[in-house]
Amino acid sequence: KYLETRMIDGEERWFRKTISNFALLNKDVYPAEIVQGKKKEYAKVHPMCEHILTQKLEENNTCDWKKVNATFYIEVPADAVPAGETIKAWLPYPFDNGRQRNFLLLSSSSQAIHSSGSLHHTVYMEQKAVKGQPTRFEMKFSYEVGAQVFHQADILKNLKSYDKQSDLYKKFTAQELPHMLVNKQMKTLAQKIVGAETNPVLQASLIYDWISANYPWAGAIDYSTIPCIPQYVLDINHGDCGQVTLLYISLLRSLGI
């Protein structure tokens, strides 16, 4: 399960992060110099986390705002599309919410059309393919990002009963295949994890802790190649942050959370 392979055009191909994943998932043989290097990286982050965690939580509060400049691009290899044909690209673009604001598109490689009003905001661009040349779509943008802290005690204090007949509740506790799985296996596993606990906030914490203890982080193969991500995590015993999040969501929804 550490060494992920795929048969592609009759050839066995190894996932490019196989070696690093093997090290991450086998602590006994993890090179000491890598462990020390990781500790140094984490040490740089800890003071920032401690500063944010000391902020007092108030309703909708966001603290420690930082301005970020970003460059995002995608490049289509030369001659992947016949010369003269139009290549259309949709690049992901952030949008305002509680933790990010003041987005500004600074530049783009071609005319950009920004979508809004959907869950997935994008910038649309198109270019003609040129023989022998790669086609690059690029945009530069800036925005501000802030931190929010949610303490369990505050969440428990403000907890209200669910309206289980509401469309909102039904929507966010429903199965959404292929990657939000609510079936007998998930329900049984979720109930086993939480035991006799009935408070949904504490149930969510128990499930979070269980996943953290049992499914270590490792680099992920492309999500589009995985038929059902939460089941994949259960089968392979590891996952990256997005993969274990989908397992977490599936287990919560299985309990009606």
Regions inferred by a protein language model and the residue ranges of each:
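Cysteine-centered nucleophilic/redox motifs
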Residues: 89, 207, 234-257
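Intrinsically disordered, low-complexity N-terminal segments that are enriched in acidic
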Residues: 1-150, 154-156
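Acidic low-complexity segments
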Residues: 116-122, 126-235
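Active-site-proximal structural scaffolding
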Residues: 82, 132, 200, 204, ...
